[in-house]
Each structure stands twice: as C-alpha cells, then as structure tokens.
C-alpha cells in the first residue's frame, strides 16, 4: 500500500512516546515519523525509523514552516500531545479517506480519553465559519492535506512563537474545509484534569498574557484578510430610557450553593447607595438546603426569591427570568452565588459609571480567592484582552468575559426591538471597572 502520511509528534523519551511511535508504525500508510524536540540541548536517542527535529516551540511559525518543508507525502499528521496515542483499527486510513475531497484541508475526529483511570468518550464539535476561538477543541490528532498546509503556511508572514498553529488553521479555512469525522478513531490520555470551570480562566491568566497578545494579533490579521475587522464605533446609550421602580437589581442565579449563598446575599444587602435597589435570587431547584437559606429572607422586601416552574433553565434562562421580572431595576447586576463584593460602594460605583459613560454594559475586574478569601491563581482578573480599539473584535476569539461582574442596561435587554441596538452598542459601549 502507498505510504501517504508523514507524522510529526512532540518528543521526549518516555513510555508514552514509545507507545505513540509504535501505534503510528503499525499503520501501513505511514511513511516517516518526525520527532519534534523542544529541548534541543538535551541529547535524545533516536528510535528506529524516526528523525529528530529540534524546534523552538510546537506552536511557532518556524515549526509550521519546517513541517511544510519536510513533508513530502500527500498528508501531514500532527499530534499535539506527549501522552500515549492509541489508534482504532485503520483509523488513519479512515481519516485520509476524507482528505481525498479536494475542498478538505484538515480532518479531526471524536475520540476516547483515559481520565483518572477511566476510559471516556470525548466527542468534538463541527467546525463552522464562526468557530474562531483559539481554544476550539479539535482533539490532539490532526491530519492535513499537504498542499493546503503549505498554502496556509505561506500566508503566515509574521513570526509567531505561540499562535502559529492557530493562525495556520485560520488561513486554512480561507481556501478549504476543516472536517469533523463523527467517529471515535483514537484514544489519548487526558493530562489536564482541572475542572472546566478552572480551565475557562486560562485566557485571562497573567502568565499567559504574552500568548494572548500573539493570538489577538493573529486573529486581527485574519479578520483583515476577510474584510471582517470592525472599526471601533462610539455610540452612546440613553441609560435613562424606561420606567423602573428600582435603579438596580442584583441578580443571583443559584443551584445547590448552601455553603456560599448566604454570604452572597449579605454582601449585596450591605451595599450603600443613593438609590433604591433590590436583590433577585433565582433558585433553580436546589436540593442541598439552599432554598431554605434563601427563605430566611422572606420578610425582607429587598430580597425577591424566584423559583422557576420550568426545570430546563440553565444560568442564562435564570438570568432572563430575573431581567423580565416586573421588579427588576434599570440596571441588572450579576453576582454569582459564590461571590462577594470587595466593599460596600460597588453598586454605587457601577451605576455612576453607567451615567458617566452612557454605555450599555459595565464589566468589573475581580479577584480569585479561596473560601478564606486568600488570593489564588490566577489572582486579579482585569480583562486586559479588552481594549477600546480592538476589544469588540477580540471578544470573538476568547472564552467569553468569564467570571466578571457583568451589568446590563435592562431596557434594551428586555426589548427585542432594542436588542439589535444593544448588540451594536454592547462592544464599543462596554466599560471596564477596577476591582469590584
């Protein structure tokens, strides 16, 4: 059978590397295996039938261009992890079948992963035109059409240390498709066992700032290439629009947070303001005693306890329920059920900012702590990824504006006719505060 794949894998001497190399050699269509050594000063033994390539980074433009130069087969396999790879029966043949389509530039597949000693299914999503987040989950096994890979690499004119693979994928989409194979074709070992709620803050971790700057530069260049880069537009919002009994509402969606919900409510109640405000707690069918704790405030008119009749509301549905409640204030202020305000003047600061900036949304800086209020990694989240010049574009690339106190002007959020205006104003009209 014709050997149609050159493989490129990160390499360090380990049992996992041996297993991956063995799995690739078992395939009759693998031509050569290149081992990417990110520690060039370290002497490594070269497994039979392989070639070691010293690289500065697995995600640099130099590495991508080296791969393009070395590849002399129709397809390029790139494995992005150092954990052991197990291939399903004729998995590579199956993946390259899809690459025979002229419009297919890259394929990726569903897979299994070993996590904490248990083998679990790991399905991935179809790639769509708007799938531009730099952390889109393709899985670690990617196979490219060599011609398309080279064409994309030639469009990468800037030197990148961290964002080259991301940029290559973006440019790949300009002239080919990224195809998801809805079959479980391999197994890998998950090495990042953090909860998804912890992983979502990676993009704001100060230690990753240099990476994020490169990612933004690559994404901005891509937007320019497709004429999709939006210029900043300064549009003021009439924050006085609408009639409201309360100037502000602190909205706390909650489910099973018996340990923290009382502290969150008390933190809101101790706010000192020059305007009337209330607290809307949306209790999404808690079962751990949270409901009873909220019930202790039944005689406090400032605390509204909502219990949805529906059982299919996530946090977004709970937010929508609260914003459309007749007693919701002019400004809907998010407070997570395990969060506290940093001082008693936070609400006043937020509302003052709305009137000063005439903006549609305010987002606050915050600090990550443990239950004893000791600062934990990544520490202060100041959302440096947002700038007045390019934040509205960069927001498409990042994992939301995660964890922040997000505050909306209620009127446009409620009214469908005004929602198109809100969408236009939300990005250029978003203002960021110091820690709240």
Language model feature labels by segment:
Residues 5-16, 27, 248-260, 264, ...:
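A conserved hydrophobic helix/loop-capping motif in glycosyltransferases and polysaccharide synthases
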Residues 22-31, 266-276:
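Short, acidic, metal-binding catalytic loop of nucleotide-sugar glycosyltransferases
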Residues 37-44, 84, 283-292, 311:
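A conserved acidic beta->alpha catalytic loop
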Residues 56-70, 309-327:
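Glycine-rich, basic loop-to-helix element that forms the pyrophosphate-binding segment
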Residues 72-86, 329-340:
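Short beta-strand-to-loop acidic/aromatic patch adjacent to the donor-nucleotide binding site
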Residues 84, 89-121, 345-378:
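Conserved donor NDP-sugar-binding/catalytic core segment of glycosyltransferases
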Residues 120-144, 149, 385-406:
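A recurrent flexible, glycine/aromatic-enriched loop bordering the glycosyltransferase active site
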Residues 159-168, 423-432:
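Acidic donor-binding loop at a coil-to-helix junction in glycosyltransferase catalytic cores
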């Amino acid at each position: 059978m014709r050997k149609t794949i050159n493989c490129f894998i990160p390499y360090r001497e380990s049992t996992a590397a041996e297993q991956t190399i063995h799995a690739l050699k078992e395939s009759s269509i693998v031509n050569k295996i290149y081992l990417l050594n990110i520690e060039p000063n370290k002497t490594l033994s070269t497994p039979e039938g392989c070639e070691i390539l010293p690289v500065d980074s697995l995600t640099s433009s130099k590495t991508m261009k080296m791969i393009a130069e070395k590849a002399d087969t129709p397809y390029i396999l790139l494995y992005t992890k150092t954990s052991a790879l197990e291939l399903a029966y004729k998995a590579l043949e199956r993946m390259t079948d899809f690459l025979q389509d002229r419009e297919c530039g890259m394929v990726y597949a569903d897979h299994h992963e070993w996590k904490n000693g248990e083998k679990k299914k790991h399905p991935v999503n179809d790639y769509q035109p708007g799938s531009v987040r730099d952390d889109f989950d393709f899985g670690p096994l990617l196979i490219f059409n060599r011609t398309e890979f080279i064409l994309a690499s030639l469009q990468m004119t800037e030197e990148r240390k961290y964002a080259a693979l991301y940029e290559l994928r973006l440019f790949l989409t300009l002239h080919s498709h990224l195809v998801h194979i809805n079959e479980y074709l391999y197994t890998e070992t998950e090495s990042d066992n953090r909860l998804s709620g912890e992983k979502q803050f990676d993009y704001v971790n100060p230690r990753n700032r240099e990476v994020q700057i490169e990612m933004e530069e690559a994404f901005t260049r891509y937007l320019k290439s497709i004429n999709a880069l939006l210029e900043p537009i300064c549009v003021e919002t009439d924050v006085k629009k609408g009639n409201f009994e309360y100037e502000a509402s602190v909205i706390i969606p909650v489910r099973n947070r018996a340990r923290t919900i009382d502290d969150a409510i008390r933190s809101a109640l101790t706010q000192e303001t020059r305007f009337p405000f209330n607290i809307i707690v949306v209790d999404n069918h808690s079962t751990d005693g949270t409901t009873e704790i909220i019930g202790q405030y039944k005689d406090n008119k400032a605390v509204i306890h909502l219990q949805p009749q529906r059982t299919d509301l996530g946090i977004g549905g709970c937010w929508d329920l609260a914003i459309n409640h007749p007693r919701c204030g002019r400004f809907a202020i998010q407070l997570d059920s395990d969060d506290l305000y940093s001082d008693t003047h936070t609400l006043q600061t937020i509302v003052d900012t709305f009137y000063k900036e005439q903006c549609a949304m305010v987002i606050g800086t915050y600090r990550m702590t443990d239950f004893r209020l000791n600062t934990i990694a990544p520490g202060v989240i100041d959302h440096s990824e947002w700038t007045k010049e390019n934040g509205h574009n960069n927001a498409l690339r990042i994992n939301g504006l995660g964890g922040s106190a997000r505050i909306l002007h209620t009127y446009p959020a409620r009214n469908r006719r005004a929602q198109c205006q809100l969408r236009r104003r939300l990005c250029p009209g978003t203002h960021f505060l110091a820690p709240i």
